[in-house]
Regions:
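Conserved N-terminal alpha-helical segment that immediately precedes and caps sugar-phosphate-binding
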Residues: 1-633
Length: 633
């Protein structure tokens, strides 16, 4: 009943700054994303943001706790571990951050102690594995395995919407263990965390997270880090602002802890804290505490990196335009090539397209020099799982390079500190430049570094972003990586908008890969068809099972629906047609329909704003012709 529905979580709301993003040209898309990303630092709606004194106090206390655990490893030879965990994007950020922090420890002669977990294991770094995300006991089991033999474990569970059952199971386990510190990171008030029943479990996310919140008031082994940074620019797409905020918060806490341990500044200009506050001291105003200055300075570095990226909005828009000119083609592809952390970020961005926009596995790809070797992932080389997991440059050369056409866009990702990059990358790039593919260059440049060696007139578009900050501890490209994430998110999101996979700021062809996305699909159908919740769900089931009479499927567990739907494309658009009054639809021919959202019809890449026509009460329609009055599946 609509009157009894709870308020929607902030992370599931529509961002008012981007509600017309589907009508924008490439530069307009980037400018709207700039406004949304500003909320990461400015906060949203009167809630505490990342710069709020209450959040800063929690971050500082967590940093002190972390530094103490790291110090015990150094001085007392203890086996303390720090474990980051999450589903989808959160798990991928957990992987990248643990890899980065371990390399910093190794550089200074310390034993790595950072670990990560991702629901579904390492295969989920490339392809979402739906059912483990909704399995709390599996989450607890995975945590027990990684904690085995440790003296103390700091567990950091990341769930942007406070909605992941996998993480809830881990928090439920960790907060009842005497040798564990429990940290929950997300971007909703705890009171709005997900409260839906979970299959084969007797608790909800909200029950677990409220218990942790209560515990955090009295214990130094429980933390909740939940600044409110506003709705995503594409509704519910936590890979964007949620993922970026996660990277900022993890960096702020754990780089500061490493600075304390190592006695080395994160940046040459950053001083060490003058003192540590007493255990009983509570700091609510960072301007009064010299101890907080390195952490505040670090947040300022991230903020300045964000500002620098969007001062290059024109360049980012030019790369977006280049990518969209290929993605909007029938067989177009966008391919990222890079090395080290920057290459891995291309891998991550490409991996997020299937669940978010329902694209094919080959439409967005990422390749990194050296492949899985040296990527710091737990399971090592994943190439044996299939073509999609073959991510080295050698595998690009054998699998993809021979098939490149003028409908493909290859984007080369460089850091200026890499000089010419790995020799193989230079060789591969030259071969790509000689191919029919459209080739772009994106350079994250370190101040004072010449980039002339990277430039080549054969690139159709080349963009250089010179950053005020680049490395952390003189080695890891933390700030360059944050900048690159913002740019890649803009490029891939913009390309999908121009392809017609977004209406307003809603992703209308999401892949139903977990419980949360199943719920989101029902909400989208309700919103755009005018149907009530019950009818919207029934239309969704009809679309999943391809039967007009879906009554037999109504009482199956949601996991059954997800298993059936996770490999299907265009389920939500089909359900929209059904919920909107289309009583007769040819299910067998639905795969032939080309995704075109009416308001972005014609793929306005060159800056021509389309003229939206009145669309009636149901909006996103999959057309087989260009005539607005033709609905055909």
């Amino acid at each position: 009943m609509a009157g009894l529905q709870e308020p929607r979580r902030v992370t599931e709301l529509s961002n008012e700054l981007t509600r017309d993003i589907d009508t924008a040209d490439p530069l307009g898309i980037v400018r709207r994303l700039c406004g949304s990303d500003a909320q990461l630092f400015a906060g949203w709606g009167g809630h505490p943001g990342v710069n709020d004194p209450v959040i800063l106090d929690r971050l500082w206390k967590l940093s002190l706790k972390t530094a103490a655990l790291l110090k015990e490893n150094q001085d007392q030879k203890k086996n303390n571990r720090i474990v980051f965990s999450g589903c989808g994007t959160s798990g991928r950020i957990a992987w990248l951050c643990s890899w980065t922090y371990n390399r910093i420890l190794q550089k200074f002669g310390h034993t790595p102690c950072f670990h990560y977990l991702i629901a579904g294991g390492d295969r989920s770094l490339i392809i979402s594995n739906e059912l483990p995300e909704d399995d709390p006991p599996k989450g607890a089991e995975d945590l027990k395995k990684v904690a085995e033999g440790a003296d103390h474990v700091m567990f950091v569970g990341i769930t942007c919407g406070l909605s992941a059952p996998y993480v809830a199971g881990q928090i439920d386990h960790s907060m009842h263990q005497p040798n564990m510190t429990s940290v929950l990171m997300g971007f909703n008030p705890v009171s709005l965390s997900r409260n839906a029943p979970i299959e084969k479990w007797d608790k909800t996310c909200r029950q677990v997270f409220l218990e942790l919140e209560t515990l955090s008031c009295t214990s130094d082994s429980a933390f909740i880090i939940n600044p409110i940074v506003g709705p995503e620019p594409i509704t519910g797409s936590s890979r964007m602002k949620g993922g970026s905020t996660t990277a900022v918060l993890l960096g702020t806490v754990f780089l500061t802890s490493l600075q304390t341990l190592l006695g080395q500044p994160i940046l040459p200009s950053m001083t060490l804290p003058a003192r540590e506050p007493e255990e009983t001291e509570v700091v609510f105003d960072h301007s009064l505490s010299p101890s907080l200055s390195p952490m505040v300075s670090l947040l300022d570095c991230y903020s300045q990196t964000y500002q620098t990226v969007y001062r290059h909005s024109g360049g980012v828009a030019s790369l977006l335009k280049l990518a969209a000119s290929c993605i909007c083609q029938p067989s177009g592809r966008l391919i990222y090539l890079g090395a080290d952390t920057l290459g891995a970020l291309g891998l991550v961005d490409a991996s997020e397209m299937v669940p978010t926009y329902g694209v094919g596995l080959e439409e967005f790809r990422g390749f990194v020099a050296g492949g899985w070797e040296g990527c710091g992932n737990t399971e090592g080389d994943l190439s044996g799982y299939g073509k999609t997991f073959r991510v080295s440059l050698s595998q690009f050369e054998s699998d993809v390079l021979p098939s490149l056409t003028d409908q493909d866009c290859v984007l080369c990702l460089h850091g200026s500190s890499q000089r010419t990059g790995p020799p193989h990358l230079h060789t591969i790039v030259n071969k790509v430049l000689a191919s029919p593919a459209k080739c772009g260059l994106l350079v994250m440049a370190e101040n004072g570094m010449s980039c002339n060696h990277l430039l080549d007139k054969r690139y159709e578009t080349a963009v250089l972003i010179r950053l005020p900050y680049y490395h952390a501890f003189g080695k890891e490209c933390v700030f360059a990586g944050f900048a690159l994430k913002l740019v890649l998110n803009a490029i891939s999101t913009g390309a999908n908008i121009l392809k017609g996979r977004v209406y307003g700021n809603e992703m209308i062809n999401l892949r139903l890969s977990n419980d949360k996305l199943f719920e989101r699909a029902i909400a989208i159908i309700e919103k755009w068809s005018g149907a009530n919740e019950e009818d919207a769900k029934f239309a969704l089931l009809r679309a999943i099972y391809k039967q007009d009479d879906a009554a037999n499927f109504q009482y199956r567990p949601i996991s059954s629906h997800i298993t059936e739907a996770s490999s299907q494309n265009m389920v939500v658009p089909l359900a929209l047609l059904l919920a909107g009054g289309r009583s007769s639809v040819s299910y067998s021919s639905r795969e032939k329909a080309a995704p075109v959202c009416q308001r972005s019809q014609g793929c306005h890449i060159n800056g021509d704003r389309p003229n939206p026509w009145p669309l009636g009460h149901y909006i996103p329609i999959y057309l087989t012709t260009t005539r607005p009055n033709t609905l055909s599946l």
